[in-house]
Amino acid sequence: MSNEAKCPFNHTAGSGTSNRDWWPKQLRVDLLAQHSSKSNPMGEDFDYAEAFKSLDLAAVKADLAKVMTDSQDWWPADFGHYGPLFVRMAWHSAGTYRIGDGRGGAGRGQQRFAPLNSWPDNVNLDKARRLLWPVKQKYGNKISWADLLILTGNVALETMGFKTFGFAGGRADVWEPDLDVYWGTESTWLGGDDRYGKGKGSSSQGEIPADAHRHGQEQARTAPAGRNLENPLAAVQMGLIYVNPEGPEGNPDPLAAAHDIRETFARMAMDDEETVALIAGGHTFGKTHGAGDAKHVGREPEGEDMDSQGLGWKSSFGSGVGGDTISSGLEVTWTQTPAQWSNYFFENLFKYEWELTKSPAGAHQWVAKGADAVIPHAHGGAPLLPTMLTTDLSLRFDPAYEKISRRFLEHPEQFADAFARAWFKLTHRDLGPRSRYLGPEVPAEELIWQDPLPQAEGAQIDAADVAALKAKVLGSGLSVPELVATAWASASTFRGGDMRGGANGARIRLAPQKDWAANQPAQLAKVLKTLEGIQSAFNQGGKKVSLADLIVLAGSAAVEKAAQDAGVAVAVPFRAGRVDASQEQTDAASFAPLEPIVDGFRNFQKQRYAVRGEDMLIDKAQQLTLSAPEMTVLVGGLRVLGNNVGGSTKGMFTDRVGVLSNDFFVNLLDMATEWKSTSPAQEEFEGRDRKTGAVKWAGTRVDLVFGSNAVLRALAEVYASADAKEKFVKDFVAAWVKVMELDRFDLK
């Protein structure tokens, strides 16, 4: 008998058949417990922003500059410079961002973890991060991996002769993979059938349907048949950052590839000019790697053996490194100076006619007809012919891209400026507003995609002012539901993925938010008109209150009144300091994806979707950075406060709407009530008296899940208990204030 067989332990913690094995559609309440203090080795007192402020950024950059040309035998630098590798590393760290849901991106250093550390498109970037370890080790916790990856990309560009637009730190690391990001449902790497619905543009598995976001809608209307990419995905195949460089599904058609490029880059919030600049700028440097057949390449890092120590993609082709490297399978070097900024990309793109060929690994690529061998070999071999990818040729043959490309060819200074700005946007898009930017290289120029805010002016309102304003609001004739709904609508646009949205700026009074269906435009206009009157009268006295502050203050006053009416005296904490943005500071197209097409906290769905309402509630709660208890108490409180959209009474399990009671939980869990579905899809339900059969309540999946899901029921029972009256109010107020202050980075 082997030693293994003699082991007295035949199980370990977490092994065996899991709950999700038995019930694959089980609600993922666990998504609300990510990145807790239990996974963070730094402790609750660690303040990354303060640590970063003590960093000598110039010294870090000097050390990074040395790394660029310090070629290591275990992974030799192409052209004697690691710059191109680090540009790709930084790009792929940031390039997972998508504007549709604000997830992905560079902000948490997720490239270190699965699945990103093992994506086919990230092949051999494990080596790039290992090259950086001595620098990370030296500066320790003063610079996060998330910041270091982006800073290294900037230093790479600068050491290759390019002037960058700037750099901002502030990306705090997390210590485990993000579990909430929807990357698609394909079960094979580089699969794309599900996201294109096998030719039908299906959206049944995503968070939202394919027509839910307006960003890039024009391109979607002209998509080739069956080429409608599921939202919010921004990559054409599982494990790619954007597009297949060989062309759609390997078809080397530059025009077809242009559609995929335009759609995926638009979903990362890039327009045509930014797209051209990024592709051409990135491909000014370095090369792709396809020295031999991919069969020589081993497993990705997550699938490798322990002695590989987190490295993957070992190659048995030749030396496996240097000139024998296999990464993408393509073997393309774009310019005559791959480690130096130039305009050679556009010069070569338009100078030559291009002939389809294949790389040594068998991948489709293009070679210049009749050209001289002017391209240097990465490791000292004979010069090479100019080569391009199918997606590079898209910049010449797509009419819109071609116009921009020719302008950049003729005006290199415009190209350099466009690339600098697009690179900064790419690497900072998910960092949030400028108030989160740290370090001496933050650019002074304010950019529209940063959702700019004006500076606060004058003294902030004090406690006496707050009390006076609350009295004015409560005496204005506006109801508790109206005030609560307006404050919630203003604050709950916040997305933890990219730190956008929230109450600061009072953009709820501007396009597009003032017209969103979830915000009940007619009611909203009425409330805002009344609040603006109160604001105007108050501001006559010398001190100023912003409408952004007043909206939140009014909602908080309503919560206090509702609690008092329930017999609980409570003061809702309020901190002034919000400002009012202008329409000129608000890019309506950029804000369109923030529209709540579903909001379980308001029992609102703009239309019926294939995704279950309770799953979308979890999604919304996760964006609001809520825990499961916070989500639970907010739903229960907002229902009895009348926060539903359009006069719906579903889920309002109370006969005293506007009173902050625990009635929602008490009545939901009442065994005298029997619930039955009233729709074939089990979307809506009636609660009937078990004895008389009389209808008592009506609810939706988002309501009944707090009784049907075991985890949520356990939480609901806490708030339904006889001794929970004060705890319920206290917990609701804490969660309410959290949401109201999610975008108050000036307080954190």
UniProtKB/Swiss-Prot annotation:
Which protein, by its recorded name, is this?
Catalase-peroxidase
Q: Where is this site: Transition state stabilizer?
A: R88
- Tell me what organism the protein belongs to: Herbaspirillum seropedicae (strain SmR1)
Give the multimer and partner information. Answer: Homodimer or homotetramer.
Q: Where is this cross-link: Tryptophyl-tyrosyl-methioninium (Tyr-Met) (with W-91)?
A: Y242-M268
Keywords, ordered alphabetically: Heme, Hydrogen peroxide, Iron, Metal-binding, Oxidoreductase, Peroxidase
Q: Tell me which InterPro entries the record gives.
A: Catalase_peroxidase (IPR000763), Haem_peroxidase (IPR002016), Haem_peroxidase_sf (IPR010255), Peroxidases_AS (IPR019794), Peroxidases_heam-ligand_BS (IPR019793)
Which reactions fall under this protein's catalytic activity? H2O2 + AH2 = A + 2 H2O; 2 H2O2 = O2 + 2 H2O
